[in-house]
Amino acid sequence: MELKLESGLPHQEYAVEAISEVFKQVEINQQVAHYSNPVIDLRSNRFIGNIYRIQQRERQNVAEKYRNEQPVGNTLCLDIKMETGTGKTYVYTHTIFELHKRYGINKFIIAVPSIAIKAGTSTFLNETYVKAHFKNTLGYDAEINVGVLEAVKKQKKGRKYFPTAVRAFVEGSRLNRNKIYVLIVNSALLTTGKMLTRNDYDVTIEGYDRPFDALRSTRPFVIIDEPHTFSRDQKAYKAIISELTPQCIIRFGATFPMTTIGKGKKKTTVRDYEHLLYDLNAQRSFSSGLIKGVMKEHFEPTSTINEKVKILDINDKKATFQHITQTSKASHVLSVGDSLSILSPELTGLTITGITKDLVILSNGMEKHKKDEFDVDIYTSSYQESMLRLAIQRHFETERDNFHREKGRIKTLALFFIDDILSFRGDDEGNNAWLRDLFDRLLEAQLKTELQKENSPGYATYLRASLNDLAACRAGYFAQDNSDPDDAVKKEVDDILHNKTELLSFVNKKGQPNTRRFLFSKWTLKEGWDNPNVFTIAKLRSSG
């Protein structure tokens, strides 16, 4: 199976053209070091006029309150708001090619919030069909060299070398006019560890002995993906500004951070746009047929358990919980690492991962304050089983329709968010994976039901292959998987993060049925990772 990209879509062209026109008739000095971007005259008055003129176009959909004529400053910041699923990654890739073609910009750093998004971005840029699209369909006479900054394991004795990805990015030369250099980095690597800040490497790059300094010398353009995770008071954003000092930051996202302006009675909270060039919001995206609508089913607990948990007090890294039943109240003082099963067996698998001066953080990502309370009902095994069964039923309803589409069959995926990794992966011996085992039993039962229906030969074969190997139908991705040595786990992670084409195929490379279509995660895939073939999403337990 080969994916195809469509060119000339107006909702994407508007964004690319807007960014490109910002630099129109701005002085750009090309006489710089071979490893550096051309120098943009950020003091040019043309920026103000160009930006304001773009914002006034009706097609850009920029609200009057976000149109401005403020000066640029030391870094030009441009904002593109695009709803999830409308092609942000494609648009910023297209923008990279266009800025290189028009202005010779060839050094871009893409900052993303997570390892999952970093992997997805790298995979997209390296795909053969993507390269062919920009070269053959759009006619760009250039190719992107993709570097991915990875965390390094503790180095043993010996010579200390610059991170390979940093070296390749910095040393990339403008003299090679058909090369564009892109470095992808997740936010944690900008702020943790000493990889980019240390200056005791044995070999320098272009005279620089500190990676951040070497990167700064390239005068990079920085693209920020998911800007709401890079607010101005966040460490990663501060590192981008102070350590990389980019000439230009282009933020692409469906959601932008909030900021407070004004004082006293005039104080208000607004979206933190700097120079918003394009606003493709949810309403416009849906009305234009660019995104799918969502049908939500709220599943009511079926158990008769009438219990609540209330947080009475939080202090000194401990929290006092009260377990309330119809007949009694019992208080327990818990600390980080304790299981809430101490309160009720229905809460097995839910632990405390953090306690601050005013809130308790649970392993499902929920944050609870003093006096907060929640029902125990939604944690019962019967509730989980009912939700799983309904999600599986809904999946097969959609899968049957998509498999027999007149315009060509579509592989249907389902995504399950869970909050207890142990329930899916099991312990070190693979035991106690109760949720995974429950899912397999329910899937097996539903497959047998589907096989009893009238099926086309092709779909019947697909269902039988699924029934013959239930484990092959599912895969999980959790943050802990990045260090898991198990080959089967690595294959699951690769299928979800890297092998998008194979995941969407009905047949694997060996010519056998590819039945993997049920994906499990905690919240690792909650943003940035997207797949148009996900038709069913189930949030198990109370995950916030």
Where are the regions that the model predicts?
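Pre-Walker A adenine-sensing motif
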Residues: 52-72
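Conserved ATPase-coupling elements of RecA-like P-loop NTPase cores
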Residues: 121, 192-201, 216, 227-239, ...
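Conserved P-loop NTPase catalytic core
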Residues: 218-221, 236-373, 413, 456-457
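Walker A/P-loop
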Residues: 71-95
